[in-house]
Amino acid sequence: MKISIVIVTYNRIPALCELLESISRQTLMPYEIIIVNDAGESVVPVKALYPELPIAVINLEKNSGHVAARNAGVKEASGDCIMLCDDDDFFTPGHIEKMAKEIETADFVHSDAEIVSFEEKNGTRYPVSRKLFAYTADYEDMRVFSTYVPSGSMYRRFLHDEIGYFDADVHNYWDWDFYLRAAKDYRVKRVPCASVIYAFSDAGDNQSADLGAKRKQYLDRLSEKHGLGELPTKNFAVLLEEPEMKRREAKSEMVWDGEPVYSRLHRS
């Protein structure tokens, strides 16, 4: 099995190095790592820090947004399976091997995660708070609120040939849209292991914390596309406390030791 990891990055060199460090510690190495630089600062020095990793860099001439950049990456992927990851998230050791085993009986696999708030000290992120993010993934429930974490998820390359690429028209909800399209006709499986560390800012400076008029517009587009009806627009943290979400809470194996990832950026 050849696994292509696709990472979109924009001016997050320290976090990107932590992700690559976590990949270098995996028990199963990917076939290729495609880093799409969305017209940010050069990542060539980052590639040089990890010469043993099969890194290819795509430099976009203008900032195209994360969905278009991700599409550029997956179109270049030549592996049998594609694994996605945001540049500020990272994997625990053994994640890739576990997902490779799970996809043997599926077309699309996604793991649970730990949602972690970090503070940065001397270029390294240290965890301040952490919360298990593990929920049942029944298709009808996923039509109401998506608990799919794209980072660390893996799917067979042919899905793009069958259902297309990521939809920039729904912007923030590209992952929810892709999940629903895939789950409708293909074998999608949740892996009950929190082997992905998902960075989330309590201060609300990332997309998952942001709620605004444009985000509501994208949510409405998603709803119209899939016939989802009126969807909740409450803050992410508030939604997780709703009774329906409490009902969906699931058991999961927690594997992260809570230690920060010290990359080669600060050892070089």
Swiss-Prot record:
One of its GO terms (molecular function) is glycosyltransferase activity. CDD domains: Glyco_tranf_GTA_type (cd00761). InterPro entries: Glyco_trans_2-like, Glycosyltransf_2, Nucleotide-diphossugar_trans. Pfam families: Glycos_transf_2 (PF00535). SUPFAM superfamilies: Nucleotide-diphospho-sugar transferases. Its EC number is 2.4.-.-. Keywords: Glycosyltransferase, Transferase. Belongs to the glycosyltransferase 2 family. This is Uncharacterized glycosyltransferase YwdF. It comes from Bacillus subtilis (strain 168). The lineage of its organism: Bacteria, Bacillati, Bacillota, Bacilli, Bacillales.
